[in-house]
Amino acid sequence: RHMLELEELKLVEQFEFDGYLLLNGGYCTIGSQIIYDNKIPQEDLKEIVKIVKENNYPCLFIESNQMYITHVNQRVIDAQASISTMIPPISNQINIDNIYQVDPYVDEKGIKEIIKNTKHVKVTKWHDYAYDIVPKTGGKAAAIQAVSKHFGYQKEELMAFGDGHNDIEMLDVVGYPIVMENGSDEVKQHACYICDDVEKEGILKGLKHFNLID
């Protein structure tokens, strides 16, 4: 998630956290301090942008302080609705110096075409027609390890909640990997505990199950 999305969902107003692991782990902060920062290399972004423009793919580009999409179609509308997030503003002015994540709204053939000439990125799927492209050295697991190192935590002291394919690497680096009931069977294979769906207060119930809150 982007901080703009957390603000849109009013999560920042409701809860005060010590830090945030944002943009699939590409941008992590503790208070006002940036402790992890991992952008997509420019050489790969140039290749991605070239293919996106040639094929007129709808694609979301995410910077630390803003995000924008090339254009909108039904795939974009459906994918954004599935995560309760508004559609970002449309722009074709892409700043390749400051991109942390790229989200193409395409099928499997499309994503293969987009990354065919890249060397330093990896892909995870979060919707039937939506993917995350992030640095190969980054991701949620790398971010958790950076935060863990910052605080001196051990793996056994860490807990993470997830429900999507793009959460698997994160679940594998914590001592308490918890998967939501709505997660796929593949994701659930990485869990030590299955909690209820998000809509049924699954995270709250999971925290109570492990006696972290009353």
Where are the regions that the model predicts?
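Asp-based, Mg2+/Mn2+-dependent phosphohydrolase catalytic module
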Residues: 173, 178-214
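Conserved acidic, metal-coordinating active-site core of Asp-based
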Residues: 51, 55-58, 62-170, 182
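Short, structured coil segments at secondary-structure junctions
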Residues: 15-16, 24, 117-119, 173-174, ...
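Well-formed, non-transmembrane alpha-helical positions, independent of function
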Residues: 10-11, 169-173
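Active-site phosphate-binding/coordination module
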Residues: 1-75
